[in-house]
Each structure stands twice: as C-alpha cells, then as structure tokens.
Amino acid sequence: MKPSLKLKKLQETVIQCRKCPRLVAYLQEVSQRKPRRYQDWDYWSNPLPSFGDPNARVLIIGLAPAANGGNRTGRMFTGDRSGEWLFNALYQFGFANQPNSLRRDDDFKLDNCYITATIRCAPPKNKPLPKEIENCRPYFLEELDLLKKVEVIVLLGQIAFTQTLKSLRSKGYDVPPLSFGHGKSYLLSRKLPTPVWNGLKPFHTELQTISLITTYHPSQQNTQTGKLTRPMFHRVFKMIKKKLEVES
C-alpha cells in the first residue's frame, strides 16, 4: 500500500479513537455549550486527523486542537486565531494556496508541508495530561514513518518541542540535551540499519539527518502580548525556506 493511502487509513483510525475518557467527555461538553457566534455550527467534536502533502519536506507540529477552532471545524488550525497566523505565513512563503481557512471544505491546500499535533483532541484549558499525550504518541510515530520525505520539522511551542524530541529519540535519533526558544535550529541524526550481504558487514553506516526549527506558538496568549510578532514568526519561515534550498 502506498504511504499516502496508509496515511489516509491512519487518519480514519485517529478519528475513531476513544482512548481518553476525559477528552471524549470534554469534546461532547464543548459541543453542547457553544459560544453564541457558533450556535449554527455542527461541531466536529472528534479526534482531528492531520493533513497536508504526503510528500512534504516540511512537517509542522502543534500542541492540540482549539475547542472552538479545529474541534469545531474538523481540521487542525482551521477557524481559530492561531490558524490565521500560521496559514497566512504558509501562504506568504509558498506552502499554501490561500492565506486563510475558515472551514475544512474551503479548498485550502498545503504544498510541500504537512500539519499534525501532539494530541488530536482539544483538552480542557488547553492542558493535556501526560497519559493523554502518551495515548496519542503511536499515531505520530506512524506518521513519522510514512512521511518519508520530511527534512525539516517545525515545532510550535514548548510541549511540541519536548514531546517530539522524545518521539525522535524512540526512533533512534541521537538527541542531546536541547533547549527550547524562538527561532532555534538543531540538526539530529540517526544511523540507518544496513543490510548484511553473505555475512559481511558494510564498510560504512548510512546516517539520516533531520532539521528542527522551534518557534513560540502563534496562540493569542503570545501574539496579543507581543511575545510573538509577525516579523518574528516570518523569520522562522525564512529559515525553513533557506534550509530547503540548501538541501535541494
């Protein structure tokens, strides 16, 4: 089966996931107490699938869906303020076909970019429990295996940074002590398994590398306080483009 079809099948599994009773209950609660401006919406209120270009060289990892954003619309970052920032930047730097997205059926598409999250359900107060993060990890690990062309991982926020390092370590990457901060860049590598022919070991071991770029999350808490400005955010995407050009 092609990786793109495996990704699609994985997302179907994600949507059906009910591993976390607290999150299942919270999603139903949110759908019953909608803000007035969303009263006419039929909330998605299920785990959110990741989305994007299955041949992407750039993987963007967020924290979790927003209760009245992606959890409402059914697509990550769609219909919330964080998404306004992210999608606008993706459009400006050539990774998206339009500068905003308000609904999952609005023909918004990503090019050479794929978006996922640390957990797939909106958590109460935007704070997932450690067990909930672990329950979601297998989905992300499978995505890493299927997104075979990814060269740059963009980490939106501290939790995405910490949990992605943990996942990459489990995939055999050499992960030294690293610190989170806006606009930092790291290069990680791992040794790939090499075949043994007629009992003879190969003369060299092949290394696979991946670049990490960190940024403050484009949440309202950061953007409205000035902790993250648009020029700061756009500098991250300039870094991404530069890395892709160097590695082409």
Protein language model regions, located:
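A polyanion-binding, active-site-adjacent surface
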Residues: 2-182, 196-202, 210-245
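The conserved 3'-phosphoadenosine-5'-phosphosulfate
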Residues: 186
